[in-house]
Curated annotation (Swiss-Prot):
Main function: Involved in the synthesis of the GDP-mannose and dolichol-phosphate-mannose required for a number of critical mannosyl transfer reactions.
Organism of origin: Eremothecium gossypii (strain ATCC 10895 / CBS 109.51 / FGSC 9923 / NRRL Y-1056) (Yeast)
PANTHER family: MANNOSE-6-PHOSPHATE ISOMERASE (PTHR10309:SF0)
Keyword set includes Amino-acid biosynthesis: no
Name this polypeptide is given: Mannose-6-phosphate isomerase
GO cellular component: cytosol
Swiss-Prot/TrEMBL catalytic activity: D-mannose 6-phosphate = D-fructose 6-phosphate
Gene: PMI1
GO process annotations (BP): carbohydrate metabolic process; cell wall mannoprotein biosynthetic process; GDP-mannose biosynthetic process; protein glycosylation
Keyword annotations from UniProtKB, A to Z: Cytoplasm, Isomerase, Metal-binding, Zinc
S-S bonds: none
Cellular localization per UniProt: Cytoplasm
Alphabetized InterPro entries for the sequence: Man6P_Isoase-1, Mannose-6-P_Isomerase, Pmannose_isomerase-type1_CS, PMI_typeI_C, PMI_typeI_cat, PMI_typeI_hel, RmlC-like_jellyroll, RmlC_Cupin_sf
NCBIfam families: manA (TIGR00218)
The EC number(s) this enzyme carries: 5.3.1.8
Length: 429
């Protein structure tokens, strides 16, 4: 396969938390790109997977050959020699690109780093199917809500002081030690910061290790407080959030370890957060583009009927306590493109991927990209146009997915002013 540009077929997952029927961007993209997909209006459509992960592998649109097999036939040409050497694979992309459409809260979860991922995979391959880490970046394509990382410690201390059932669940002694012992403004890596993290770990550990009966009884009090005394909470959005998530997962530990302990993050379309390995998070509602290191490892904490690995979770977390604003991605102009519209770079502090958003903002014309030193996957999320490299010119509509080989110069040509694409890529340097 010598083509530098070709269309891919992407598979989808129908997890229970996905948006239902044609309200789901995943369903819309799947049906628009594949006429054989008939949307079932009573079924959830949760994730569209784009990449080489064996669970849902992407395939060449015309030949139906798996992308991983095409790469294996020409690793240097399809990945670039630098990426083959760096990521030690001759058939797989180092990233997994997704669209998520979220109706119900996902499990509060964290992902292991590389060392822990390898150890967990050896010890428990059923629950940890990969040996890799899984840092993630989420870019909102509609209004989005999620939990991202632990709240700043002073907010958590105020919550403990205001909410008796939270204090009781944590334990009065541990709660008092936390409120008296935290040092606000501690420099990262300092002894004060290390002490802060240990105090936070004690609070989280006590919540996560409480019995189901104890959690349920405390959750009933918390829900009643949210109904009857919303002013008791230090954030006016919390009571409604607690009531909403309690309807989805009644009396769940997530009401404490999520609603009370994690940042409630709200993003508008185009805004983005980066979620490091070993930081707790959960998506609540909305449609997002997600990119991650190629792994499917999850350590769950709450809002889930699935396996919860409390011991590993409590031990593995970083216990960082940054604000939402500190976790939002800084959007950068992309210097290696030109023409109509613009391209914004989302560049997280990891090696496996970066993402470009190209939007024509009501204009028409062509946007040109210089060749990149690695492979890319592109999805059209809105509007229509064409994608071209050399003599290959392909129609691009919402849900259409493409592979671009290293060093291929590419033009996006808009047919309407809403034409928007996202492009995940990796370069060795």
């Amino acid at each position: 396969m010598s083509a530098k540009l070709f269309r891919l077929d992407a598979g989808y997952q129908q997890y229970d938390w996905g948006k239902i029927g044609s309200s789901s961007a995943v369903a819309q993209y799947a049906a628009n790109s594949d006429p054989s997909v008939q949307i079932e209006e009573d079924k959830p459509y949760a994730e569209l997977w784009m990449g080489t992960h064996h669970k849902v592998p992407s395939r060449h649109h015309d030949t139906k050959v798996a992308l991983s097999d095409l790469i294996a036939a020409n690793p240097e040409g399809m990945l670039g020699s630098g990426n083959v050497e760096k990521f030690h694979s001759r058939k797989d992309l180092p990233f997994l690109f997704k669209v998520l459409s979220i109706e119900k809260v996902l499990s509060i979860q964290a992902h292991p780093d590389k060392n822990l991922g390898r150890r967990l995979h050896i010890q428990d391959p059923k629950n940890y199917p990969d040996d890799n880490h899984k840092p993630e970046m989420a870019i909102a394509i509609s209004d989005f809500e999620g939990f991202c990382g632990f709240k700043p410690l002073e907010e958590l201390a105020e919550e403990l002081q205001r909410i008796p059932e939270f204090r009781s669940l944590v334990g009065e002694d541990i709660a008092a030690q936390f409120c008296a012992g935290i040092k606000v403004g501690a420099q990262e890596g300092s002894e004060e910061d290390k002490s802060n993290r240990k105090l936070l770990q004690s609070v989280f550990s006590n919540v996560m290790n409480a019995s189901d009966d104890v959690i349920a009884s405390h959750a009933r009090h918390l829900v009643e407080r949210a109904k009857q005394s919303p002013a008791d909470f230090n954030n006016e959005t919390l009571p409604a959030l607690i009531l909403r998530l309690n309807e989805q997962f009644p009396e769940d530990v997530g009401l404490f370890c999520g609603c009370l302990m994690l940042n409630h993050c709200v993003l508008k379309a185009g805004e983005s957060i980066f979620l490091r390995a070993k930081d707790p998070h959960a998506y609540i509602t909305g449609d997002i583009i997600e990119c991650m290191a190629a792994s499917d490892n999850v350590v769950r904490a709450g809002f889930t009927p699935k396996f919860k690995d409390v011991k590993n979770l409590v031990e593995m977390l970083t216990y960082s306590y940054d604000s939402v604003e500190d976790q939002k991605m800084k959007l950068l102009p992309f210097a290696r493109s030109s023409g109509s519209g613009d391209s914004i770079l989302y560049n997280p502090p990891i090696e496996e991927f970066a993402v470009l958003q190209t939007n024509f903002h009501g204009s028409t014309g062509t946007h040109h990209f210089d060749g990149l030193d690695g492979p890319s996957i592109v999805i059209t999320t809105n509007g229509s146009g064409y994608i071209q490299s050399g003599d290959v010119r392909l129609k691009a509509e919402a849900g259409y997915v493409f592979f671009i080989a290293p060093h291929a110069e590419v033009d996006l040509q808009t047919e309407d002013s809403n034409f928007t694409t996202y492009r995940a890529f990796v370069e060795p340097n």
